[in-house]
């Protein structure tokens, strides 16, 4: 999360748009899905071991798991259909996969991990409720914070990827 942007009026501060995920995405498109996953892993590991983590490694794990699902989906589909149509189908599919994986992972894994480093789930829900009064439980936090955040993040990554792909299309083929 070397180049990350919080959106404080829309989401709690620990949910950040991490533009550096583009590196893993472009690596996956150009070198294949496993390369993309490896880049995502190394990026998050480097973030953690350099002491830049503000979440005790939980945020990096979440970024790898959820962002990695996006990178893998896009790059796998592109590896089967190496043209602009493959990129678009991959990006749209990646948005869906990242949103679903993000919701499931946060409900069962990520939010409970935050509790192990001293953040109660109730405190996390309260952070969301301060922004959106419809949030009153872990499930409503997932529905009203996690799902929209992952749609926004993966949608933004998709919008940034398309012009980069067009500029590098000949090299990638």
For the regions a protein language model found, what residue spans apply to each?
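Loop-helix junctions at membrane interfaces
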Residues: 1-173
């Amino acid at each position: 999360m070397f180049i990350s942007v919080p959106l404080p009026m829309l989401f709690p501060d620990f949910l950040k748009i991490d533009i550096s995920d583009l590196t893993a995405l472009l690596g996956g498109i150009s070198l294949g899905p496993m390369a993309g996953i490896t880049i995502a892993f190394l990026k998050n590991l480097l973030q953690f071991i350099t002491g830049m983590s503000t979440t005790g490694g939980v945020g990096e794990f979440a970024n790898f798991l959820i962002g990695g699902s996006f990178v893998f989906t896009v790059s796998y589909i592109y590896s089967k259909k190496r043209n602009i149509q493959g990129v678009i189908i991959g990006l749209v599919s990646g948005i869906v996969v990242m949103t679903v994986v993000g919701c499931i992972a946060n409900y069962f894994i990520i939010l409970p991990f935050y509790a192990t480093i001293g953040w109660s789930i109730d405190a996390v829900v309260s952070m969301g409720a301060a922004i959106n009064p419809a949030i009153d439980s872990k499930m409503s936090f997932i529905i009203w914070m996690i799902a929209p955040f992952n749609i926004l993040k993966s949608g933004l990554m998709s919008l940034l990827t398309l012009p980069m792909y067009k500029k590098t299309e000949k090299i990638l083929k």
